[in-house]
Amino acid sequence: DQKPELSLPAVADRVMEALGKYDFIVTNFANGDVIGHTLNTAAKLEACKHVSHYLDVVVHDALAKGYVVAVTADHGNIEKLYTAAGKPDGAHTTNLVPFILMDPAHSGPIALRDGCLGDVAPTVLNVMGIPQPAEMTGKSLAEGHDFGKDRKMLLIICDGWGLGSGDDGDAIHLADTPYWDSLLAEQSWSKLHASGEHVGLGSGKAGNSEAGHSNLGAGRCVMQDDVRLD
């Protein structure tokens, strides 16, 4: 918690170096999970500020270079500051996570449906015009949108970045996050399940990075070890 920005400036630089070189780029902003596990409220607010700032930097560059950009999360964490007993909370949550989609070739809103993490990879394939394999049982979150041909895409995963309560117990709400606020106010977005049976965990169980990233990449619900062993 002594360096809430972690290596995010360097991560952002690497992403921007890759823009224009690769058709598909995926990056992980780890601050929400790493700093979210601490009990340091000031550090959490600072981490949220850095995530918002570097989203602004990276997303603007990607859109200017013609990339379709999606911003989502693998599970919740940093948004919840306190337990039900009012004590500092550093655990993962069962909160929904956002899925924001921006298409620089389209000026109007994009119709998005709510879903789960297993729907993200099919959405990527939809954007890029790649046939979806039978093994992916998820469905595109933007089935009705015409992305055209030969599109490039940037997927940003904000680790541990759930949709919180929107009050004084919500770090993202309290933090100085003007760009994040503008994304929710101005861009098309939907809500994704990132916990419990929706990601192959036990019912009611908080999401985690392993379940989150495996579902995001697989395009389906991946049964996790705690369920498989039961």
Predicted regions and their residues:
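Feature captures the catalytic ectodomains and active-site-proximal regions of enzymes
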Residues: 1-230
